[in-house]
Amino acid sequence: MNIEKIMSSLEAKHPGESEYLQAVKEVLLSIEDIYNQHPEFEKSKIIERLVEPDRIFTFRVTWVDDKGEVQTNLGYRVQFNNAIGPYKGGIRFHASVNLSILKFLGFEQTFKNALTTLPMGGGKGGSDFSPRGKSDAEIMRFCQAFMLELWRHLGPDMDVPAGDIGVGGREVGYMFGMYKKLTREFTGTFTGKGLEFGGSLIRPEATGFGGLYFVNQMLQTKGIDIKGKTVAISGFGNVAWGAATKATELGAKVVTISGPDGYIYDPNGISGEKIDYMLELRASGNDIVAPYADEFPGSTFVAGKRPWEVKADIALPCATQNELNGEDAKNLIDNNVLCVGEISNMGCTPEAIDLFIEHKTMYAPGKAVNAGGVATSGLEMSQNAMHLSWSAAEVDEKLHSIMHGIHAQCVKYGTEPDGYINYVKGANIAGFMKVAHAMMGQGII
């Protein structure tokens, strides 16, 4: 494999798409050795086919705001790869959304979904529409207008979206309702639905729950008990909430959360009503965490900074891509962090990842750590297909088993001669091998 040649070609075809190119390069570096052991992959040009999406839909979304003024946004759906199942991946509503971000997320999703062992391909979609500051009626009208274009490309065996940043249960409900009206079918075409119409128990907290199950497995490989360990978390939405809830349940102490305005440090631990307050902060729509310090004496708000300067045993990025950089990694390493688990997608910069691996710090990438969310989406698809509903305990048990299996795959492919587990390499190889063999088995298409 000539990585330099492949990347040069992609950079020429997709200039400026930094997030997408970063994601592709990371995977290629990890799989180079094993790819070169399979000449049949090169003959079938597996890499060249895998790094480009099957198709991309870009469309205008026109809607009317509460003032009666016409607004326009861009909508996207990237159907990346369906070698192992229907396209599966969330929809993101945020002002920062662009094609590069969605292609990176769809590419990552392809491998993440493969790791779950469930039959799901990779995809991602979204819009540069931001729900922040919008009324409920405006959000409903936008979701309906968005689906007027996208519905024709979706289906339970074709492409199954879910939520993501800016898209929660409310937005999924509005989109599913419009899809149902347009198709006149009630099928499992969306996941993350309300419990009353086909949703799965523990789906909102599944990404955070699964992340902690994975991190706990990482610690156990070193004989370390998570009980009593301090945890630094970024973000304060559903993912951070789920992570904080499960970390506390496992006996750890969460000491930070963060938002665009800065971070909260609570040495007494964020548990009980404090965890519930995270959801109140998110529901307020203000996108700030500063009010936490006013609500709970003994905690401190640090404006304009990220939580990685706090001494903690475990660091869990739960907010967005590239939120933990090289300087942050140095701070964590200097503070003797035991484990870093990306619960956000591509939460660490390449420089940060290199530093963790160089210092033999336990680090695992988002495609493995945060796979609990899409795994539970897959379980929701299964429940919809069988027209039944599992209990929370059943779903949680299956989620725990899936995360245990993902960790085992990472250990299998990522263990180095000195015993260090390179989870980046392990996750990339495990996901790639499944997708590559599936593509080989289906011919040149």
Swiss-Prot record:
GO terms for molecular function: glutamate dehydrogenase (NAD+) activity; glutamate dehydrogenase (NADP+) activity. Keywords: NAD, Oxidoreductase. Belongs to the Glu/Leu/Phe/Val dehydrogenases family. Its EC number is 1.4.1.2. Pfam families: ELFV_dehydrog, ELFV_dehydrog_N. Homohexamer. NAD(+) binds at residues 235-241. It comes from Bacteroides fragilis (strain YCH46). The keyword Calcium does not apply. It is an enzyme of class 1 (oxidoreductase). It comes from the Bacteria. The keyword Nucleus does not apply. Induction: By high peptide concentrations. It catalyses: L-glutamate + NAD(+) + H2O = 2-oxoglutarate + NH4(+) + NADH + H(+). The active site is at residue 124. GO terms for biological process: glutamate biosynthetic process. GO terms for cellular component: cytosol. This is NAD-specific glutamate dehydrogenase. The gene is gdhB.
